[in-house]
């Protein structure tokens, strides 16, 4: 699908990637999931996904066009400060969805899919990408994490999303 506006500039840095991996793995450790490994090919894919998502307002593009076999978490933030938001901000918002996850009824995940993908035990590799720049009103940041193996598979939540 063609975008509504040009993509925002890439803002993926080594520091951003280090923070993304550290933040993700800190939360995964709480849930007895093995640490993720940063995969260079997935980093490039996440960067391209962040750019393409930024061609649309906020998160309107959703997960359209996501390649098969890949999980994805999407974050959008905007504000008056002219600097990209940190990976930790995205991870904190995704992890906060734990409030909606019922470990006693693990198949009901309508409002907590970012959390469950983040801590999904079966995911072993990740990539992260960030774009940021001036939007129509505010300075905008899009952050994408991609995962392989993808999470959120029906019938597999209890084994892959463990209590802290």
Where are the language model's segments positioned?
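Non-transmembrane alpha-helical segments in soluble domains
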Residues: 25, 47-50, 75, 91-95, ...
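Generic short alpha-helical segment signal, independent of protein family or function
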Residues: 51-54, 79, 95, 99
């Amino acid at each position: 699908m063609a975008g509504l506006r040009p993509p925002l500039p890439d803002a993926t840095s080594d520091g951003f990637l280090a923070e993304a991996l550290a933040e993700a793995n800190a939360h995964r450790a709480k849930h007895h999931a093995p640490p993720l490994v940063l995969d260079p090919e997935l980093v490039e894919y996440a960067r391209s996904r962040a750019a393409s998502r930024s061609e649309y307002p906020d998160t309107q593009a959703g997960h359209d066009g996501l390649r098969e076999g890949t999980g994805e978490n999407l974050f959008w933030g905007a504000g008056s400060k002219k600097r990209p938001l940190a990976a930790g901000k995205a991870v904190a918002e995704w992890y906060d969805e734990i409030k909606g996850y019922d470990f006693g009824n693990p198949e009901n995940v309508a409002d907590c899919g970012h959390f469950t993908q983040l801590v999904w035990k079966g995911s072993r590799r990740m990539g992260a990408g960030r774009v940021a720049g001036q939007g129509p009103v505010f300075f905008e940041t899009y952050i994408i994490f991609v995962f392989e193996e993808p999470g959120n598979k029906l019938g597999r939540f209890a084994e892959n999303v463990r209590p802290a």
